[in-house]
Amino acid sequence: MAKKVTGFVKLQIPAGKANPAPPVGTALGPQGINIMGFCKEFNARTQGGDMIIPVEVTIYADKSFTFILKTPPAAELIKKELGVERGSGQPNKVKVGTITRAQLEKIATTKMPDLNCESMESAVAMIAGAARSMGITVKD
């Protein structure tokens, strides 16, 4: 028989840098799970990375937990690919960079397992939309 699920929490934590302070402690503390146990396991599974990692934590009735690591957000992958610090505050007026089709395909390939799309073409279109909303010019 499967364990009874009592909670489900989504977090975005820098790879290898989970600690009991907020946001981890405030999200997981009320659920009653071992926060240090989560932090140690998360850090072990994400060591050596420098990206923000989305994680989905499932909490069971016996206060045990499991978690699934997702791919980094598209905006983080775009910023890393272009080497920009942040997107534009006025994306329609101020552009912060240019991204090529090859770079979009590379990011879409990385992000594909977590995207809600069937083809690579639609994945590239989703990533291109994220880039445009950050003030990045998409070059075909």
UniProtKB/Swiss-Prot annotation:
Biological process annotations from GO: translation
Database matches in Gene3D superfamilies: Ribosomal protein L11, C-terminal domain (1.10.10.250), Ribosomal protein L11/L12, N-terminal domain (3.30.1550.10)
InterPro entries documented for this protein: Ribosomal_uL11, Ribosomal_uL11_bac-typ, Ribosomal_uL11_C, Ribosomal_uL11_C_sf, Ribosomal_uL11_N, Ribosomal_uL11_N_sf
Pfam family, one: Ribosomal_L11_N
UniProt xrefs under CDD domains: Ribosomal_L11 (cd00349)
Name listed for the protein in its UniProt record: Large ribosomal subunit protein uL11
Subunit comment: Part of the ribosomal stalk of the 50S ribosomal subunit. Interacts with L10 and the large rRNA to form the base of the stalk. L10 forms an elongated spine to which L12 dimers bind in a sequential fashion forming a multimeric L10(L12)X complex.
Keywords: Methylation, Ribonucleoprotein, Ribosomal protein, RNA-binding, rRNA-binding
Cysteine-cysteine disulfides: none
Keyword field contains Ribonucleoprotein: yes
Gene Ontology, cellular component aspect: cytosolic large ribosomal subunit
